Structures are given as C-alpha cells and as structure tokens.
Amino acid sequence: VAAACSTTAVPCDEVEITTGENGLPDLGGCEFTFAVENAYLPFNYIDAADGVAKGWDYDVFNHMGELMNFTPVYIPAAWDGMIQAVADGQFMVAGDGITITAERDEIIDFSDGYINLAQRVLVAVGNTEITSIDDLKNGDYTVATQKGTTNYEFAVSELGEDKVQAFDDFNFAIQAVISGDADASIIDETAGLGYMGANKDQVKLVGGDLTSEQLGFAFPNGSPLVDVVNQGLAAMKDSGKLAEINAKFFSPDFSVTYDDIAECDENIPEEYLPEDCEV
C-alpha cells in the first residue's frame, strides 16, 4: 500500500484517461491520492499486530486500482477538516464513510452512493431504559457522537446541544457509552454493526431507523475522477465484489476492536487508549 506521493509519478487528475481492455477507464498507472483517517472502523485502520493498513476503504480502492490501472496513495488525515481539505484540492478523493448531503455537495463533488445507511441509537448492552430516540428526547440522558458528522447534526437537532457530547473520534464516543460516561450514541448503522461485532457483549443497537442516507466518496468540485470511480463502483456491483467486501466489514462478524489497532497518541484520553500504549 502506497503511503506517500512519489516525485516522479503522474497524478491521476492530470492524466489522459483511455479505455482499457475490460471496457473501464485506464489511468495509465498514475497515483490517486486518497485521504483516510486510519481510525474509523471498519472503513480504515492500522492493524496493531502487523502494522498493515486495512479496512473497507482499502479493499475497495485497491480493487479499483487493479481494475482501472492506478496506484492508490493513502494519506492519513484528521476527520475534522478532511472535507474542506478535499474541497481545497489537497486530496483527489476521501473515504471515511462520508454521508452525502446537500450542504457538503456545495463545496465538493460526490461519487454515486455505495451504501444505503440509516442512523441508529447505540447503547450499552445492559441498558433497558433507552429503547428509542423518544426516550433520549424525554429523559435526562447524554448522547456521545463525533463532531463534524451528520450523526452530530442529527443529535443536536433532535435532542438539543446540551444533551450532546462531541468527540474528535468516534471510538472515544463508543468507549464513553461502554464506560458509562455517556448513555447512548447516534451512529450510522453500518458502523454500528461493526462496533457490535467488536464489542458483542458491551453494546447494542436499539429502536428503528432514524434517517435514510447514502455514503459516497468525496472529490474536489469538477474532478474528472468522479466518473472514473463511478464506473469502478458499477463494475464492482455488477461482479459481486462490492457485496463481498461489504459482507466482510459491515456485519456483526467483523471482530476488530479499537484495542486491535495502532492508535497511541498523547492527545487521546488515557482511559480510551489501548492497554499496551505508552505515551
């Protein structure tokens, strides 16, 4: 997996796109810069056991690179500011499970949606008081979520800012629920299933769907690469490859936890660090 741009390779947003023998765009081996947080299960993370970058984003975009003759160059970026960085042209594309919204579409372009999702309420497995969003509205509860996300926006709009505790990373929000520092979280169902797989004895999803949205890849406005990725997504849907990758990462069988990923940072609250971290 490439981690940084070389000084000689041609950027994919500057190449002449031809058609390959498979009928898909051929990008001639160019480098395609891709922003990843590397801290958002199951989309992208660094496996602490072997130091290898893994996740849905990696599997999908690596396969696209094989289909359309480009080299993904994954560049770590903080979620807070990622969308603006894409809008400013710092990256050719961003993953990280970005929800397609009209507000975001004003400053960036989106690919076709690759997953339909719903927002759900997540609570500790032993919690019997909270069974729906109505319980959160009517009770004295604290809801943890990640700042800058549609989950945060929904929580504030439905519950009021005083009830919402915002974290820089979603894993902190989930750990707050597990530890009892927060009563619930508002989370995308796909990510929630991943957390349930990783913490089957600690968290659960309750209530029905709160919203219906789609996730898409984010690009600078006017990027010629949007159509390239859309064709790649369509090909992966037709071949069954996308469904195969979705089943791998978006189900309770996904068992990677935040204790299994390399994310030791002195800025992370000590109670949320993996046990073997020394910072």
Give names to the regions the model predicted.
Residues 44-47, 61-68, 151-168, 196-197:
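Ligand-binding cleft/hinge of the Venus flytrap
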Residues 9-22, 150-165, 205, 234-279:
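Ligand-binding clefts/hinges and TM-proximal coupling segments of bilobed small-molecule sensing domains
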Residues 12-97:
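Extracytoplasmic small-molecule ligand-binding "clamshell" domains
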Residues 81, 97-106, 153-157, 178, ...:
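A ligand-binding cleft/hinge motif common to bilobed small-molecule-binding domains
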Residues 58-67, 127, 134, 149, ...:
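Extended ligand-binding regions for polar small-molecule ligands
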Residues 38, 115-123, 189, 193, ...:
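Periplasmic-binding protein-like
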Residues 30-36, 133-148:
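Short loop->beta-strand "edge-of-pocket" segments that line small-molecule binding or catalytic clefts
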Residues 58, 71-135:
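Acidic, polar ligand-binding/catalytic clefts
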